Amino acid sequence: MAPQTKIDRSFSALTPALSEWIIDAVDAMGFVKTTPVQHAAIPMFMKNSDVVVEAVTGSGKTLAFLIPIVERLLREDAPTKKHHVGAIIISPTRELATQIHTVLSSLLKFHAPSAAMLEPDDEDTDMEDADTPPKPTFPPGTLKAVPQLLLGGSVTPAQDLSAFLKKSPNILIGTPGRLLELLRSPHVHCPQSSFDALVMDEADRLLDLGFKEDLQKIISRLPKQRRTGLFSASMSEAVDQLIRVGLRNPVRIAVKVKARATGEDGKIEDKRTPASLQMSYLVTPPSHKIPAMKKILSSLQPQPQKSILYLSTCFSVDYFQHVLPEVLQGYDIVPLHGKHPDKVRRKNFNKFVDSVTPSILLTTDVAARGLDIPSVDLVFQLDPPSDPKTFIHRCGRAGRAGRRGLAVTFLNPGREEDYIEFLQVRQTPISPLTTPEITVTDEDAKAVTSKIRKKVREDRALFDKAQRGFVSWVRAYSKHTASSIFRIDDLDWTELGNAWGLLTLPGMPELKKWQGDKRLGIELDLATYAYKDKAREKLRLEELERDKEEGTKKKQHKKEDREKSAWTEQKESKATKEVRREKKKSKREHERLAKMTDEERKEEDRVQAMIEQMRKKVAKQEAEDADFEGFSD
């Protein structure tokens, strides 16, 4: 057998050759060689080919489309005309769009003309020192790449248009809605002579979030003669439909990881996650999950600096962000979910990314796709995702770009263990967590539950958050797509209450038939349970006093109300019966008339006329009798 030829995966070995400044840029960014997806996609996209790229999470898709876009724009015969667009990159989320823009800006800092456009205008900055070097200038015909980020929620569409007219960017990056807003302006032009490339990143996510109509409208505004790249971690029927509409004879690139099976057959099987990522599961009761997570964090060497903990709902995040610091001491807990205002989301995301101390991002699926969080060591899934497709995207936050990572999914004993086989069928095999070896005792679980409850007792606001979060979690669990595995009827409510550190189980339909202790063996006087916030506590006490006064009045009028109610109900009942009787009578009469022949109906009309005539005669006689006052004396 002939020896295999070693492939040169350096960026300088790509064909067509990359510009020297691009090679310098990726080298400075720490990328020594191309990933498989970059090695396959960059040459094809730089040529005149549409590409459909299916690659595992964390495979370097972002540079795989940014490098070709920049190279193509900077190799044009003339610079892009003013207010003309050369390329558009569509992202499903604001966070992902922001990261794409950040990576592109880092790349363009190595191209002097483009880097000059990234700097703020002189009028937007304070007066500079005399020693500050002047801003470099370039001839009018100099080619450059100028990006603009378009995000809903942060600035208005009018501000986006103002920035576009001022800077005249030729690369637009944003979410579908805000991109479409800008493209509708008569001042924004995408003619065939200028427009070069369209990229749809995380295409399946774009469709899952309901952006199909916006995507079609964007595509309809672009010239058909263009290069199009569709990048995604998975393919679906909806994505295939988008490919048929938006791409012309695309080159399909599927980059998967090959892993040798552990069975005796020695088969080679495809994996949809990086080889550097270890995906494991731990079967443990609900109240043991947080203690187990604590032991995993303390057992790993070196200590994980960045970890992600996934929960199923926003309200769950709102609750656990307050109680987990009591248990996971030494870690910064950073919350991030879709209901946070845009400024809060950006602030918390940047706080986690820039953190230099051990941190845990507490989040929902808003961070499961596309977010390029560097150096994530560990991913926990306290709740398996409701959509199985999301599983690999959650796990894929760790083990990116060849870095070793660990993803641990917690499962309840019993039916939930079927989830393991469920994932294997979908080419996502997971193995039991053996390293580190974790053992949690009932005493460990009780100690953690006690700490959480102690924290919750300090402030009634946490009690409210716990109740709301638990109800939202139960509803999310009941809507799991793998409903045969995740069943409400199989839940141990006492275990769950202890796992959450609840002081009492909330009143909800799922617990109506449950015969257990909803107070969880805890004494709690809600009348004296106070809010830490003085204004909120004052309002609660006022409402409590008002309820007491209304309760006294209700007792005084209870008997009277009951008597009135009984008499009223009796009268209403009689009237209701009378109305019902009349309706039945009318219905029977209608049915009787409907069955008559024409002759019978004529006879009926004649009889009714005679009866009516007789009624009038009798009524007239009664009126005359009423006027008669007797004989005079």
From Swiss-Prot:
Residues 547-581, 588-623 have a biased composition (Basic and acidic residues). Pfam families: CTE_SPB4 (PF13959), CTT_SPB4 (PF23681), DEAD (PF00270), Helicase_C (PF00271). Residues 119-131, 624-633 have a biased composition (Acidic residues). It is found in: Nucleus, Nucleolus. Belongs to the DEAD box helicase family. DDX55/SPB4 subfamily. PANTHER family: RNA HELICASE (PTHR24031). This is ATP-dependent rRNA helicase SPB4. It comes from Phaeosphaeria nodorum (strain SN15 / ATCC MYA-4574 / FGSC 10173) (Glume blotch fungus).
